[in-house]
Design a protein with these regions (language model features):
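Short, structured surface patches at the beginning of a domain
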Residues: 1-129
Length: 129
């Protein structure tokens, strides 16, 4: 049975916007989600275009958090930890919040986080983002 999944993508700079990286992040994540036997409804693709990763007040992220809290999302795909947040404390907060609500967070460009060593690597990447 296919798992319900969502995608979160973010860019903050004009250069990133010009390079169309939010679309490329989304396309890569959609492709990856299909390999993990997940279905991503179109309205479960959350994007924050032009928002800094150093703040939590982002419209796409807020809608995503609401949906995760309602228990609908089983898997969340994000390109890399720094796309979720540029602050380590916020990354930990969000990852724990999603996990507590039953959503697995999968980063395309990072260690999987399935064991203590991989979780430590994700945390380390968050500290230097």
């Amino acid at each position: 049975m296919k798992r319900n999944a969502a995608i979160y993508a973010r860019v903050s700079s004009d250069r990133q916007r010009e390079q169309n990286t939010i679309a490329s992040q989304t396309a890569l994540l959609l492709e990856y989600a299909t390999t993990r036997d997940c279905v991503v409804p179109q309205d479960w693709i959350f994007q924050d275009d032009g928002y800094s990763g150093s703040v939590l007040a982002r419209p796409g992220l807020e809608r995503l958090r609401d949906l995760v809290a309602e228990g609908f999302i089983e898997t969340l795909f994000v390109y890399a930890p720094d796309r979720l947040s540029r602050k380590y404390a916020y990354q930990v907060l969000l990852l724990e919040e999603f996990s507590r609500c039953g959503a697995e967070t999968v980063f395309l460009k990072s260690a999987g986080g399935d064991n203590p060593e991989e979780r430590l690597l994700v945390q380390f990447q968050g500290m230097i983002a």
